[in-house]
Amino acid sequence: MQALINNVTHSFTSIFGYAPTHFIQAPGRVNLIGEHTDYNDGFVLPCAIDYQMVVAAAKRDDNLIRVIAVDYQNAQDQFSLEHPIEFLPNKMWANYIRGVIHFLQQAKYVFQGMDIAITGNVPQGAGLSSSAALEVAIGQTVKTLYQLPISQKEIALNGQKAENQFVGCNCGIMDQLISACGEESHALLIDCRSLATTAVKMPESAVVMIINSNKKRGLVDSEYNTRRQQCEEAAKILNVTALRDATLAQLQAKKALMNDKVYRRARHVITENERTLQAAEALKQGDLTKLSELMAQSHISMRDDFEITVNEVDTLVEIVKSVIGSQGGVRMTGGGFGGCVVALVTPDLVAKVTQAVEAQYKKQTGLKETIYVCSASQGAGYLEITNGIK
Protein backbone atom coordinates (compact mmCIF):
# COMPACT_ATOMS: atom_id res chain seq x y z
CA MET A 1 0.00 0.00 0.00
CA GLN A 2 2.79 2.46 0.89
CA ALA A 3 4.34 2.04 -2.57
CA LEU A 4 0.98 2.86 -4.18
CA ILE A 5 0.63 5.97 -2.00
CA ASN A 6 4.16 7.10 -2.89
CA ASN A 7 3.52 6.54 -6.60
CA VAL A 8 0.22 8.33 -6.75
CA THR A 9 1.55 11.25 -4.67
CA HIS A 10 4.55 11.65 -6.95
CA SER A 11 2.39 11.83 -10.09
CA PHE A 12 -0.16 14.17 -8.46
CA THR A 13 2.50 16.57 -7.16
CA SER A 14 4.67 16.63 -10.27
CA ILE A 15 1.76 17.15 -12.70
CA PHE A 16 -0.61 19.35 -10.67
CA GLY A 17 2.17 21.24 -8.89
CA TYR A 18 0.87 20.89 -5.33
CA ALA A 19 0.30 18.11 -2.77
CA PRO A 20 -2.95 16.10 -2.48
CA THR A 21 -5.07 16.59 0.63
CA HIS A 22 -6.78 13.17 0.75
CA PHE A 23 -6.02 9.52 0.01
CA ILE A 24 -8.75 6.94 -0.61
CA GLN A 25 -8.56 3.21 -1.32
CA ALA A 26 -10.98 0.62 -2.70
CA PRO A 27 -10.10 -3.09 -2.92
CA GLY A 28 -10.49 -5.81 -5.53
CA ARG A 29 -12.28 -9.00 -4.54
CA VAL A 30 -12.47 -12.74 -4.93
CA ASN A 31 -15.66 -14.77 -4.75
CA LEU A 32 -15.20 -17.77 -2.44
CA ILE A 33 -18.41 -19.49 -3.59
CA GLY A 34 -21.68 -18.59 -5.33
CA GLU A 35 -21.02 -18.49 -9.07
CA HIS A 36 -23.56 -17.25 -11.63
CA THR A 37 -26.06 -16.95 -8.78
CA ASP A 38 -26.07 -13.14 -8.65
CA TYR A 39 -28.29 -12.51 -11.69
CA ASN A 40 -30.62 -15.28 -10.46
CA ASP A 41 -31.33 -13.21 -7.32
CA GLY A 42 -29.25 -15.66 -5.28
CA PHE A 43 -26.41 -15.62 -2.76
CA VAL A 44 -22.67 -14.96 -3.14
CA LEU A 45 -19.81 -15.12 -0.63
CA PRO A 46 -16.93 -12.84 -1.68
CA CYS A 47 -14.19 -11.17 0.34
CA ALA A 48 -12.28 -7.98 -0.40
CA ILE A 49 -8.56 -8.60 -0.98
CA ASP A 50 -5.44 -6.63 -0.10
CA TYR A 51 -4.90 -5.50 -3.68
CA GLN A 52 -6.48 -2.12 -4.24
CA MET A 53 -6.98 1.12 -6.16
CA VAL A 54 -5.53 4.17 -4.42
CA VAL A 55 -6.61 7.74 -5.21
CA ALA A 56 -4.83 10.95 -4.25
CA ALA A 57 -7.22 13.89 -4.40
CA ALA A 58 -7.89 17.52 -3.61
CA LYS A 59 -10.90 19.81 -4.02
CA ARG A 60 -10.93 22.62 -6.58
CA ASP A 61 -12.88 25.84 -6.25
CA ASP A 62 -14.27 25.59 -9.79
CA ASN A 63 -16.22 22.83 -11.60
CA LEU A 64 -13.31 21.20 -13.39
CA ILE A 65 -12.42 17.52 -12.89
CA ARG A 66 -8.79 16.69 -13.73
CA VAL A 67 -7.66 13.06 -13.67
CA ILE A 68 -4.27 11.33 -13.94
CA ALA A 69 -4.10 7.58 -14.64
CA VAL A 70 -0.70 6.74 -13.14
CA ASP A 71 -0.73 3.18 -14.52
CA TYR A 72 -1.33 4.40 -18.08
CA GLN A 73 1.89 6.43 -18.28
CA ASN A 74 0.23 9.32 -16.43
CA ALA A 75 -2.43 9.70 -19.15
CA GLN A 76 -4.81 12.55 -18.37
CA ASP A 77 -8.47 13.42 -18.74
CA GLN A 78 -10.28 16.66 -18.01
CA PHE A 79 -13.96 17.60 -18.10
CA SER A 80 -16.34 20.13 -16.61
CA LEU A 81 -19.33 19.51 -14.37
CA GLU A 82 -21.08 22.38 -16.16
CA HIS A 83 -21.49 20.42 -19.40
CA PRO A 84 -22.99 16.99 -20.15
CA ILE A 85 -20.34 14.33 -19.43
CA GLU A 86 -19.61 12.42 -22.63
CA PHE A 87 -18.36 8.89 -23.34
CA LEU A 88 -14.85 8.74 -24.87
CA PRO A 89 -14.53 5.78 -27.28
CA ASN A 90 -10.73 6.21 -27.54
CA LYS A 91 -10.00 6.53 -23.80
CA MET A 92 -11.77 3.61 -22.13
CA TRP A 93 -10.19 3.98 -18.67
CA ALA A 94 -11.60 7.51 -18.39
CA ASN A 95 -15.19 6.36 -18.93
CA TYR A 96 -15.32 4.53 -15.59
CA ILE A 97 -14.55 7.81 -13.83
CA ARG A 98 -16.81 9.91 -16.06
CA GLY A 99 -19.66 7.40 -15.57
CA VAL A 100 -19.42 7.44 -11.77
CA ILE A 101 -19.41 11.25 -11.65
CA HIS A 102 -22.22 11.49 -14.24
CA PHE A 103 -24.55 9.31 -12.15
CA LEU A 104 -23.64 11.07 -8.88
CA GLN A 105 -24.67 14.32 -10.57
CA GLN A 106 -27.84 12.71 -11.87
CA ALA A 107 -28.71 11.59 -8.32
CA LYS A 108 -28.57 15.31 -7.37
CA TYR A 109 -25.57 15.09 -5.04
CA VAL A 110 -23.92 18.50 -4.75
CA PHE A 111 -20.17 18.78 -5.34
CA GLN A 112 -17.60 20.84 -7.24
CA GLY A 113 -14.41 20.14 -9.13
CA MET A 114 -11.43 18.07 -8.01
CA ASP A 115 -7.96 16.97 -9.01
CA ILE A 116 -7.40 13.22 -8.74
CA ALA A 117 -4.59 10.78 -9.50
CA ILE A 118 -5.25 7.02 -9.54
CA THR A 119 -3.02 3.98 -9.27
CA GLY A 120 -3.62 0.37 -8.29
CA ASN A 121 -2.25 -3.15 -8.04
CA VAL A 122 -5.47 -5.11 -8.67
CA PRO A 123 -4.44 -7.36 -11.58
CA GLN A 124 -6.40 -6.39 -14.70
CA GLY A 125 -8.20 -9.03 -16.73
CA ALA A 126 -7.83 -11.65 -13.97
CA GLY A 127 -11.45 -11.43 -12.84
CA LEU A 128 -10.54 -9.74 -9.54
CA SER A 129 -12.72 -6.70 -10.26
CA SER A 130 -10.25 -3.94 -10.99
CA SER A 131 -13.03 -1.98 -12.73
CA ALA A 132 -15.41 -2.20 -9.75
CA ALA A 133 -12.55 -1.12 -7.43
CA LEU A 134 -11.97 1.92 -9.66
CA GLU A 135 -15.67 2.87 -9.71
CA VAL A 136 -15.98 2.52 -5.94
CA ALA A 137 -12.71 4.42 -5.35
CA ILE A 138 -14.02 7.38 -7.36
CA GLY A 139 -17.41 7.35 -5.60
CA GLN A 140 -15.64 7.17 -2.24
CA THR A 141 -13.37 10.07 -3.25
CA VAL A 142 -16.28 12.39 -4.08
CA LYS A 143 -18.04 11.33 -0.86
CA THR A 144 -14.91 12.04 1.21
CA LEU A 145 -13.95 15.37 -0.39
CA TYR A 146 -17.46 16.82 -0.28
CA GLN A 147 -18.92 14.91 2.70
CA LEU A 148 -21.78 13.58 0.57
CA PRO A 149 -24.65 11.92 2.49
CA ILE A 150 -24.27 8.73 0.46
CA SER A 151 -24.18 5.22 1.94
CA GLN A 152 -21.60 2.58 0.98
CA LYS A 153 -24.40 0.59 -0.66
CA GLU A 154 -25.34 3.59 -2.80
CA ILE A 155 -21.70 4.07 -3.82
CA ALA A 156 -21.76 0.44 -5.01
CA LEU A 157 -25.05 0.85 -6.90
CA ASN A 158 -23.79 4.06 -8.49
CA GLY A 159 -20.64 2.24 -9.66
CA GLN A 160 -22.69 -0.61 -11.11
CA LYS A 161 -24.87 1.89 -12.97
CA ALA A 162 -21.75 3.55 -14.41
CA GLU A 163 -20.44 0.19 -15.67
CA ASN A 164 -23.78 -1.00 -17.08
CA GLN A 165 -25.15 2.20 -18.56
CA PHE A 166 -22.15 4.46 -19.22
CA VAL A 167 -19.29 2.07 -20.00
CA GLY A 168 -21.72 -0.47 -21.47
CA CYS A 169 -20.63 -3.67 -19.68
CA ASN A 170 -23.16 -5.97 -18.03
CA CYS A 171 -22.38 -6.86 -14.43
CA GLY A 172 -24.20 -7.87 -11.26
CA ILE A 173 -23.87 -5.90 -8.02
CA MET A 174 -21.48 -8.23 -6.13
CA ASP A 175 -18.18 -6.68 -7.26
CA GLN A 176 -19.03 -3.11 -6.31
CA LEU A 177 -20.79 -4.11 -3.09
CA ILE A 178 -17.88 -6.10 -1.67
CA SER A 179 -15.41 -3.36 -2.66
CA ALA A 180 -17.54 -0.72 -0.92
CA CYS A 181 -18.67 -2.75 2.11
CA GLY A 182 -15.99 -5.39 2.75
CA GLU A 183 -14.70 -5.95 6.29
CA GLU A 184 -11.22 -6.94 7.38
CA SER A 185 -10.87 -10.67 8.23
CA HIS A 186 -14.43 -11.31 7.02
CA ALA A 187 -16.18 -12.58 3.92
CA LEU A 188 -19.54 -11.02 3.07
CA LEU A 189 -22.63 -13.13 2.45
CA ILE A 190 -24.66 -11.06 -0.01
CA ASP A 191 -28.31 -11.61 -0.84
CA CYS A 192 -28.39 -10.33 -4.42
CA ARG A 193 -32.15 -9.73 -4.28
CA SER A 194 -32.43 -7.58 -1.15
CA LEU A 195 -28.73 -6.51 -1.12
CA ALA A 196 -28.66 -7.47 2.57
CA THR A 197 -25.12 -8.31 3.67
CA THR A 198 -23.88 -10.45 6.55
CA ALA A 199 -20.22 -10.34 7.59
CA VAL A 200 -18.83 -13.85 8.11
CA LYS A 201 -15.62 -14.18 10.16
CA MET A 202 -12.84 -15.96 8.29
CA PRO A 203 -11.02 -18.62 10.32
CA GLU A 204 -7.56 -17.45 11.37
CA SER A 205 -6.25 -20.75 10.04
CA ALA A 206 -7.33 -19.87 6.46
CA VAL A 207 -5.25 -18.12 3.80
CA VAL A 208 -6.81 -17.04 0.48
CA MET A 209 -4.75 -18.07 -2.55
CA ILE A 210 -5.74 -16.87 -6.00
CA ILE A 211 -4.09 -18.60 -8.93
CA ASN A 212 -4.52 -17.08 -12.38
CA SER A 213 -4.48 -19.74 -15.10
CA ASN A 214 -3.45 -17.01 -17.58
CA LYS A 215 -5.73 -18.71 -20.09
CA LYS A 216 -7.13 -15.84 -22.16
CA ARG A 217 -10.85 -15.70 -21.55
CA GLY A 218 -12.63 -16.21 -24.87
CA LEU A 219 -16.39 -16.27 -25.58
CA VAL A 220 -17.15 -14.75 -22.19
CA ASP A 221 -19.84 -12.29 -23.28
CA SER A 222 -21.76 -14.54 -25.67
CA GLU A 223 -21.62 -17.54 -23.34
CA TYR A 224 -22.58 -15.40 -20.33
CA ASN A 225 -25.64 -14.11 -22.19
CA THR A 226 -26.60 -17.67 -23.25
CA ARG A 227 -26.35 -18.92 -19.64
CA ARG A 228 -28.45 -16.01 -18.47
CA GLN A 229 -31.16 -16.75 -21.06
CA GLN A 230 -31.16 -20.45 -20.13
CA CYS A 231 -31.64 -19.55 -16.45
CA GLU A 232 -34.51 -17.20 -17.33
CA GLU A 233 -36.10 -19.92 -19.47
CA ALA A 234 -35.89 -22.39 -16.56
CA ALA A 235 -37.42 -19.84 -14.15
CA LYS A 236 -40.31 -19.29 -16.57
CA ILE A 237 -40.99 -23.05 -16.89
CA LEU A 238 -40.83 -23.39 -13.09
CA ASN A 239 -43.14 -20.39 -12.75
CA VAL A 240 -40.85 -18.54 -10.32
CA THR A 241 -39.55 -14.95 -10.39
CA ALA A 242 -35.95 -16.18 -10.40
CA LEU A 243 -34.14 -19.50 -9.84
CA ARG A 244 -33.43 -18.31 -6.28
CA ASP A 245 -37.09 -19.22 -5.56
CA ALA A 246 -36.92 -22.78 -6.95
CA THR A 247 -36.16 -26.06 -5.19
CA LEU A 248 -34.56 -29.21 -6.57
CA ALA A 249 -37.87 -31.03 -6.09
CA GLN A 250 -39.68 -28.46 -8.27
CA LEU A 251 -36.95 -28.77 -10.90
CA GLN A 252 -37.23 -32.59 -10.94
CA ALA A 253 -41.01 -32.34 -11.31
CA LYS A 254 -40.70 -30.15 -14.43
CA LYS A 255 -37.65 -31.89 -15.93
CA ALA A 256 -39.66 -33.29 -18.86
CA LEU A 257 -40.69 -29.76 -19.90
CA MET A 258 -37.16 -28.43 -20.46
CA ASN A 259 -34.23 -29.48 -22.59
CA ASP A 260 -31.27 -31.12 -20.87
CA LYS A 261 -29.02 -28.03 -21.03
CA VAL A 262 -31.61 -25.74 -19.46
CA TYR A 263 -32.25 -28.38 -16.77
CA ARG A 264 -28.54 -28.65 -15.92
CA ARG A 265 -28.04 -24.87 -15.87
CA ALA A 266 -30.92 -24.56 -13.40
CA ARG A 267 -29.61 -27.45 -11.30
CA HIS A 268 -26.27 -25.65 -10.94
CA VAL A 269 -27.88 -22.41 -9.75
CA ILE A 270 -30.29 -24.08 -7.30
CA THR A 271 -27.59 -26.27 -5.74
CA GLU A 272 -24.99 -23.46 -5.76
CA ASN A 273 -27.30 -21.21 -3.75
CA GLU A 274 -27.69 -23.94 -1.15
CA ARG A 275 -23.92 -24.54 -1.10
CA THR A 276 -23.25 -20.83 -0.61
CA LEU A 277 -25.49 -20.63 2.46
CA GLN A 278 -23.87 -23.78 3.87
CA ALA A 279 -20.38 -22.41 3.13
CA ALA A 280 -21.11 -19.22 5.10
CA GLU A 281 -22.09 -21.41 8.05
CA ALA A 282 -19.00 -23.65 7.67
CA LEU A 283 -16.76 -20.57 7.49
CA LYS A 284 -18.32 -19.18 10.67
CA GLN A 285 -17.69 -22.52 12.45
CA GLY A 286 -14.12 -22.68 11.08
CA ASP A 287 -15.03 -26.02 9.47
CA LEU A 288 -12.51 -26.27 6.62
CA THR A 289 -13.43 -29.91 5.92
CA LYS A 290 -17.03 -28.97 5.16
CA LEU A 291 -15.86 -25.98 3.14
CA SER A 292 -13.53 -28.23 1.17
CA GLU A 293 -16.46 -30.46 0.26
CA LEU A 294 -18.71 -27.54 -0.76
CA MET A 295 -16.06 -25.86 -2.92
CA ALA A 296 -15.30 -29.19 -4.63
CA GLN A 297 -19.02 -29.70 -5.38
CA SER A 298 -19.24 -26.11 -6.67
CA HIS A 299 -16.40 -26.73 -9.11
CA ILE A 300 -17.88 -30.01 -10.38
CA SER A 301 -21.23 -28.28 -10.86
CA MET A 302 -19.61 -25.44 -12.84
CA ARG A 303 -17.68 -27.96 -14.92
CA ASP A 304 -20.45 -30.48 -15.66
CA ASP A 305 -23.79 -28.67 -15.26
CA PHE A 306 -22.98 -25.05 -16.09
CA GLU A 307 -20.08 -25.94 -18.44
CA ILE A 308 -18.00 -22.81 -17.88
CA THR A 309 -14.60 -24.26 -16.93
CA VAL A 310 -11.74 -24.99 -19.32
CA ASN A 311 -9.02 -27.63 -19.25
CA GLU A 312 -6.37 -25.26 -17.82
CA VAL A 313 -8.58 -24.26 -14.89
CA ASP A 314 -9.63 -27.87 -14.22
CA THR A 315 -5.94 -28.83 -14.25
CA LEU A 316 -5.10 -26.16 -11.65
CA VAL A 317 -7.94 -27.33 -9.41
CA GLU A 318 -6.72 -30.94 -9.58
CA ILE A 319 -3.11 -29.95 -8.78
CA VAL A 320 -4.17 -27.89 -5.74
CA LYS A 321 -6.63 -30.54 -4.56
CA SER A 322 -3.92 -33.20 -4.64
CA VAL A 323 -1.90 -31.12 -2.14
CA ILE A 324 -4.60 -29.86 0.25
CA GLY A 325 -7.00 -32.81 0.47
CA SER A 326 -9.74 -31.85 2.93
CA GLN A 327 -7.57 -29.23 4.69
CA GLY A 328 -8.99 -26.48 2.51
CA GLY A 329 -11.10 -25.85 -0.57
CA VAL A 330 -10.40 -25.00 -4.20
CA ARG A 331 -12.58 -24.14 -7.19
CA MET A 332 -12.77 -21.92 -10.23
CA THR A 333 -13.88 -18.38 -9.41
CA GLY A 334 -15.36 -15.73 -11.69
CA GLY A 335 -17.35 -15.82 -14.91
CA GLY A 336 -15.54 -18.80 -16.42
CA PHE A 337 -13.79 -19.79 -19.68
CA GLY A 338 -10.37 -19.09 -18.19
CA GLY A 339 -9.43 -16.77 -15.34
CA CYS A 340 -8.59 -17.81 -11.79
CA VAL A 341 -9.06 -20.49 -9.20
CA VAL A 342 -9.47 -19.61 -5.53
CA ALA A 343 -8.13 -21.81 -2.74
CA LEU A 344 -8.72 -21.48 0.99
CA VAL A 345 -5.83 -23.24 2.68
CA THR A 346 -4.06 -23.48 6.03
CA PRO A 347 -0.89 -21.32 6.23
CA ASP A 348 1.43 -24.35 6.29
CA LEU A 349 0.15 -25.45 2.86
CA VAL A 350 0.82 -22.20 0.96
CA ALA A 351 4.42 -23.12 0.06
CA LYS A 352 3.45 -26.71 -0.85
CA VAL A 353 0.62 -25.55 -3.14
CA THR A 354 2.95 -23.00 -4.76
CA GLN A 355 5.63 -25.66 -5.36
CA ALA A 356 3.16 -28.16 -6.82
CA VAL A 357 1.59 -25.62 -9.17
CA GLU A 358 4.98 -24.30 -10.33
CA ALA A 359 6.22 -27.84 -10.95
CA GLN A 360 3.17 -29.24 -12.76
CA TYR A 361 0.93 -26.58 -14.33
CA LYS A 362 3.21 -25.41 -17.14
CA LYS A 363 4.26 -28.99 -17.87
CA GLN A 364 0.62 -29.99 -18.34
CA THR A 365 -0.75 -26.91 -20.12
CA GLY A 366 2.13 -24.92 -21.61
CA LEU A 367 0.99 -21.84 -19.63
CA LYS A 368 2.64 -20.10 -16.67
CA GLU A 369 0.38 -19.30 -13.72
CA THR A 370 0.43 -16.21 -11.49
CA ILE A 371 -0.12 -16.74 -7.75
CA TYR A 372 -1.51 -14.15 -5.31
CA VAL A 373 -1.59 -14.83 -1.58
CA CYS A 374 -4.21 -12.57 0.00
CA SER A 375 -6.05 -11.81 3.17
CA ALA A 376 -9.65 -10.65 3.57
CA SER A 377 -9.49 -6.86 3.73
CA GLN A 378 -11.37 -3.70 4.60
CA GLY A 379 -13.69 -2.17 2.00
CA ALA A 380 -13.32 1.32 0.53
CA GLY A 381 -12.44 4.25 2.73
CA TYR A 382 -10.31 7.25 3.60
CA LEU A 383 -6.65 6.49 4.33
CA GLU A 384 -5.16 8.24 7.35
CA ILE A 385 -1.58 8.94 6.34
CA THR A 386 0.27 9.03 9.63
CA ASN A 387 3.80 8.14 8.58
CA GLY A 388 4.19 10.73 5.82
CA ILE A 389 5.17 10.13 2.22
CA LYS A 390 8.37 8.21 1.76
UniProtKB/Swiss-Prot annotation:
What reaction does this enzyme carry out catalytically? alpha-D-galactose + ATP = alpha-D-galactose 1-phosphate + ADP + H(+)
Pathway connected to this protein: Carbohydrate metabolism; galactose metabolism
Q: What is its main location?
A: cytoplasm
Q: What are the EC numbers?
A: 2.7.1.6
| Keyword Ion transport annotated | no
Q: Which PANTHER family match?
A: GALACTOKINASE-RELATED, MEVALONATE KINASE/GALACTOKINASE
- Give the protein's biological function: Catalyzes the transfer of the gamma-phosphate of ATP to D-galactose to form alpha-D-galactose-1-phosphate (Gal-1-P).
HAMAP family under this entry? Galactokinase
Name-wise, this protein is Galactokinase
| Organism of provenance | Proteus mirabilis (strain HI4320)
Q: Identify the coding gene.
A: galK
